[in-house]
């Protein structure tokens, strides 16, 4: 019986192999001949091949017609002082959200310089995300490992990326501290190694929690074990980022940089005085996604920073209306949290983001014709980097260029 079964399997595999070879859909010799004709090997083809084979494609595609001088005048601008630097980390969302608040603080108090600690909220963000993962594992413990939600959790146990919703959720719960109270570390400026180690530990813990649940552990036991696990994650975060302060002294300076007063604060009292305590109610997230219906609110489950926080939630609007709101926000002296697909057409040497920066079509001898809707539908484009929109230049009431 066993030999017969094996013979059937072998025969079926052989038949499938023959059908695959003889069936339509593969590249036949005739088709390959037609395909090869697309490269003629002309002098122009050879020159392009030599150039592309020995150079960075991006440099060759740099559009010289778009290299004229840049006009740095902006008709509407929110003033700020200094530049904050996320270094080699994915904390753009956090720096951007804090910069929106920082501009208001600089304007209100007339400080020469001022910066919130980005490490402080990032510490709590990572701990909260670890809890989000572990609790998500507990919630889905009855589902198989092949379940889509379970797969997503194990694929995304921890990230240093985020959205403005995360800024609001973390800051409203833990408060803020000045830069000096919790300064940058090597791990905060270069997050990948720390994130990889914590993610590896979380995945290990996730499997342990699933095993406990499968063995019949009660919710109280799972909660207790999760708390112990988070203790290990907390220690790892302290080793990498430092101990978050619970109270501190802050020396306030006047507009000339002279010390005026030493204030004693907790993170929540510092938020109360120098930050925006209405982050959860004063702001909404807007999105332009032409692949989905406009004038509707969308929510992405588990894409949040706290288990008890708010999912990434946004109102989908035509881009023209979002531009109008951006102008209104800047006219109201409020910078705007802004994100888009940055990497493809950013000329970092000039500090210019323009779809005309690189002419890949002329270089490759073909067109890239998908519109925004099609690029989103095919996962070819998406929001990749958050920035603070601080100025625009208007041309007949429309945005001609922007400063971020």
Over which residues does each language-model region extend?
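N-terminal regions that are enriched for targeting/export leaders
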Residues: 22-82
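Bacterial Sec-dependent N-terminal signal peptides
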Residues: 1-23
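Beta-sheet entry/capping signal
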Residues: 82, 91, 118-120, 335-337, ...
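Active-site nucleophilic cysteine motif
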Residues: 87-101, 158-165, 385-386
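Conserved small/polar residues in nucleotide/adenosyl-binding loops
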Residues: 402-404
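Active-site-surrounding "flap" and adjacent substrate/cofactor-binding loops of secreted or lumenal enzymes
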Residues: 69, 105-136
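Predominantly the structural core of cysteine protease catalytic domains
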Residues: 127-393
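Short, flexible loop/turn elements at secondary-structure junctions
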Residues: 82, 87, 96-99, 120-127, ...
């Amino acid at each position: 019986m066993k030999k017969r079964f094996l013979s059937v399997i072998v025969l079926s595999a052989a038949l499938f192999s023959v059908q695959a070879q003889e069936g339509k859909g593969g590249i036949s010799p005739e088709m390959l001949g037609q395909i090869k004709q697309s490269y003629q090997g002309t002098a122009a083809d050879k020159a392009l091949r030599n150039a592309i084979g020995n150079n960075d494609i991006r440099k060759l595609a740099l559009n010289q017609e778009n290299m004229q001088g840049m006009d740095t005048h902006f008709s509407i601008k929110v003033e700020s002082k200094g530049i904050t630097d996320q270094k080699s980390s994915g904390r753009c969302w956090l720096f951007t959200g804090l910069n929106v608040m920082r501009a208001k603080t600089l304007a209100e108090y007339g400080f020469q310089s001022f910066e919130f600690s980005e490490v402080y909220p990032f510490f709590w963000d990572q701990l909260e995300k670890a809890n989000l993962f572990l609790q998500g594992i507990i919630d889905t413990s009855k589902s198989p490992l092949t379940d889509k939600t379970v797969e997503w959790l194990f694929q995304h146990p921890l990230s240093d990326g985020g959205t403005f919703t995360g800024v609001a959720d973390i800051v409203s719960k833990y408060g803020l501290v000045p830069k000096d109270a919790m300064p940058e570390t090597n791990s905060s400026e270069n997050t990948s190694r720390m994130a990889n180690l914590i993610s590896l530990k979380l995945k290990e813990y996730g499997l342990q929690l699933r095993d406990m649940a499968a063995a019949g552990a009660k919710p109280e036991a799972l909660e207790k074990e999760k708390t112990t696990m988070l203790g290990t994650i907390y220690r790892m975060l302290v080793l990498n980022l430092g101990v978050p302060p619970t109270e501190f002294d802050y020396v306030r300076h006047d507009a000339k940089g002279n010390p005026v007063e030493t204030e004693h604060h907790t993170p929540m009292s510092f938020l109360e005085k120098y930050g925006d305590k209405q982050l959860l109610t004063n702001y909404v997230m807007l999105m332009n996604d032409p692949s989905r219906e406009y004038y509707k609110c969308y929510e992405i489950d588990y894409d949040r920073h706290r288990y008890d926080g708010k999912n990434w939630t946004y109102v989908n609007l035509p881009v023209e209306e979002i531009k109008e709101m951006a102008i209104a926000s800047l006219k109201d002296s409020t910078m705007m949290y802004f994100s888009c697909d940055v990497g493809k057409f950013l000329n970092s040497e000039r500090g210019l983001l323009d779809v005309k920066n690189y002419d890949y079509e002329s270089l490759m001898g073909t067109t890239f014709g998908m519109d925004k809707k099609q690029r989103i539908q095919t996962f070819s484009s998406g929001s990749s980097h958050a920035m603070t929109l601080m100025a625009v230049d208007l041309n007949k009431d429309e945005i001609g260029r922007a400063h971020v």
